[in-house]
Amino acid sequence: MKKYKDNFNNIIIMSYCIVTGSGGLVGSETVRFFSNIGYNVVGIDNDMRKYFFNTSTQSITDILKSKYSNFTHYNIDIRKKDELETNIFKKLGNNIKCIVHCAAQPSHDWAAKEPHTDFEVNAVATLNLLELTRKYCQKASFIFMSTNKVYGDNPNRLDIEELETRWELKGRGSIDENMSVDHCKHSLFGVSKLAADAMVQEYGRYFNMNTVCFRGGCITGPNHQGAELHGFLSYIVK
């Protein structure tokens, strides 16, 4: 039994998980999870939240660096494919078992302020990561934190029933991934995330890669660096 346990430990020691947006709400929790189960975790975060919203994730990054000896942080802009390749993907190669892509420009209003920046961060940078994964660690799992905003305003067309304490979907339990993402208004943020979402799916089907999109919405928590344009629940509580 000890032999098998040792072999398992050796596998984990050589296994790396890449987390983009590692100082953010979801990214930092992902770092904690994979660090706690024994993976070497590489976090990528250049604190663009400071540029977007004048708030910072640096304090979260500092906590992670001090707490986890198996966590390494890289201050790299995910739009810079060459830096990602040289510093991380080329060095680690097939030892990368998982990429959890959480980094994003996450605000509807901010996207309209700088559409090019929004699309480069959300869509083009996702393509960078997909290509590097395909080139250096094609069997790795690629997990993309998408958004329910890919559905645009299509949910507004659903039949809603007013109950005593809440609104509920009439005649159906929930909304699944079969809902259309087409013929609707999204916001520029929703469109850039939709482009990335579709690309992640396509790399899975076209190149037979292990990809998945998680379409969350209005996520918050104790480590959310809330700002007026993003993370509003956290912002008003603080």
Model-identified regions with their sequence ranges:
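N-terminal Rossmann-like NAD(P)+-binding domain of SDR-like oxidoreductases, especially those catalyzing
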Residues: Y4-I219, H224
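Glycine-rich phosphate/pyrophosphate-binding beta-alpha loops
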Residues: G231
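Alpha-helical substrate-binding/gating segment
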Residues: S234-K238
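Conserved non-cysteine loop/helix-boundary elements of the Radical SAM core domain that shape
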Residues: A227
